[in-house]
Amino acid sequence: MPRAAILDVDGTLVDSNDAHAQAWVTAFNEAGIDVSYDRVRRAIGMGGDKLLPHVSGLSAESQVGRRVSARRGEIFRSDFLPHLNGFPRVRELVQQLLADGYRVVVASSAESQELDPLLEIAGITDLLQARASSNDANRSKPDPDIVVAALNRSGAERSQAIMLGDTPYDVEAALAAGIEIVGVETGGWGPDDLRGAAEVHTGVAELCAHYPDSIFARLAAASSLP
């Protein structure tokens, strides 16, 4: 029976959440809309279609909303994306998951044109079995559609899948999809914010250090029993 490790990207594998927030704030400011950085930062991890009305009251389908969203993408890709870094030991974690028989799939609210370079930055493009982005779902996080799309592409049952994410929106999406999730604090949220996660680690590096005791290792061991 296949097992799946479903990985979020922004804030989990790549240190990009602050950059996303600043790109949104700049785009809002250019449109004459006053939205604080802190308000936007706490919404990073939602899909852009949900973040936009959440922080500004603008409909994502409105003319202004579409303009702000498009400009945010331009700013992020030109001003921030070239300078981002992956978190330590990301490739090592994915290699360990593969060695334990997991099919590794990413589930990200990013659009494909941003997801591809982010995966290059994380250093795992060649290791992935599949991916699901906002282009593959009707509803973005915290709705479960992207996670379900990733799960379906993995071929695993819900009981054989674990997600890794950094925001409360990842936790909500995973639980709504019926799978367990491991949280990391590198996105800016702590254990209280990630309540509902089976485990919370300071980051991928700590998860790697404690991998033999993790839920990933336990599921792999249990699934290997005759």
Name each model feature, range by range:
Residues 1-3, 95-98, 111-226:
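Asp-based, Mg2+/Mn2+-dependent phosphohydrolase catalytic module
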Residues 2-91, 95-102:
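N-terminal helical cap/lid subdomain that shapes the substrate entry/recognition surface
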Residues 12, 108-110:
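Conserved phosphate-coupling serine/threonine residues in phosphotransfer and NTP-handling enzymes
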Residues 86, 107, 139:
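Residue-level marker of regulatory loop/turn positions in helix-turn-helix DNA-binding domains and
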